[in-house]
Amino acid sequence: MDTPNKDDSIIRFSVSLQQNLLDELDNRIIKNGYSSRSELVRDMIREKLVEDNWAEDNPNDESKIAVLVVIYDHHQRELNQRMIDIQHASGTHVLCTTHIHMDAHNCLETIILQGNSSEIQRLQLEIGGLRGVKFAKLTKASSFECNE
């Protein structure tokens, strides 16, 4: 029999809210298809923890991970090569890229990155600022591993 991990146990606690905040919370539960208030609150806490974790910019912390989604005009001269050059010159580890042809003019690329937050964000800004790039969005993530 497996011994329960302390992270697996659920702790119940109460929160006091004004009625308008509770109404907004309940509206989001319905709108986003959550099964309970607890599920929504857990997601909101995780999102805030990722945001705070990324704000702590330690240059020696190479554990940040993110996905950069880029849509660009593949007819833009040398754009693809410039994007590759930026990735190679960056201090960020490019773990994986996926490239798809959306239509006759546009490509979508996902780039999975690992490194410190400032290097990852710098790479996103450099690629996003290239002529021919129509969209560049960075999605920040965390595994929520606890260092004990």
From Swiss-Prot:
It holds the Pfam family NikR_C. PANTHER family: NICKEL-RESPONSIVE REGULATOR (PTHR34719:SF2). InterPro entries: Acetolactate_synth/TF_NikR_C, ACT-like_dom_sf, Arc_rbn_hlx_hlx, CopG, CopG/NikR_regulator, Ni_resp_reg_NikR, Ribbon_hlx_hlx, TF_NikR_Ni-bd_C. It comes from the Bacteria. Ni(2+) binds at H88, H99, H101, C107. This is Putative nickel-responsive regulator. Binds 1 nickel ion per subunit. Belongs to the transcriptional regulatory CopG/NikR family. The keyword DNA-binding applies. GO terms for biological process: response to nickel cation. Its cofactor is Ni(2+). GO terms for molecular function: DNA binding; DNA-binding transcription factor activity; nickel cation binding. Keywords: DNA-binding, Metal-binding, Nickel, Transcription, Transcription regulation. Transcriptional regulator.
